[in-house]
Amino acid sequence: MNETIELKSGQQGYIEYKSSNPFEFYHILNELDKAPEIDAQGWLIFPEKGKGPFPVIFCVHGSDNWAGHHHEHILNFLEAGFAIFRVHSFDSRGVASTVEDQMSVTAAMMMVDTFEALKIVSRHPDIDTSRIGITGWSLGGTVSFYSFWEP
């Protein structure tokens, strides 16, 4: 889906890519090719200090979207020498929050957004592909937890 996106050394910032809208994990496992395609977005940020290739942490927000405490953690990751990719699943779908409607953006949708970003970021010459992690808060924690599951 994103095979043609190539990032160059030093390239960071806002990234647009393709993802899809599987409603639940069943659709990821059995019908991902039938899920509607969307334009997804995120931010790749490198530490100010240090020399790559950098380990990377994919950061996934919770039901109330990105908030101040998430950014505090991200700053700590950057200061510790990690690159981060901040997944923006809600913005990609025009949703501000799922607190009142958890079905408007599901964990399955957010997982596909994260893994599609992984496909792109793992080809970046400044990323150490042997050191890739994921963290999430609340709903994003669900994405993080299930990302290690092998069916």
Question: Where are the model-predicted features located?
Answer:
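Short, conserved glycine- and acidic-residue-centered signature motifs
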Residues: 35, 70, 107-110
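Short glycine-enriched nucleophile-adjacent loop
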Residues: 141-151
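Short substrate-entry loop that stabilizes the transition state in hydrolases
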Residues: 50-54, 59-96
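Surface-exposed, active-site-proximal loop segments in enzymatic domains
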Residues: 95-104
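N-terminal cap/lid segment of alpha/beta-hydrolase-fold proteins
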Residues: 1-52
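Alpha/beta-hydrolase active-site loop
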Residues: 103-125, 146
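Short, well-ordered alpha-helices that flank and scaffold nucleotide-derived cofactor binding pockets
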Residues: 75, 79, 123, 149-150
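Alpha/beta-hydrolase fold nucleophile elbow
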Residues: 127-138
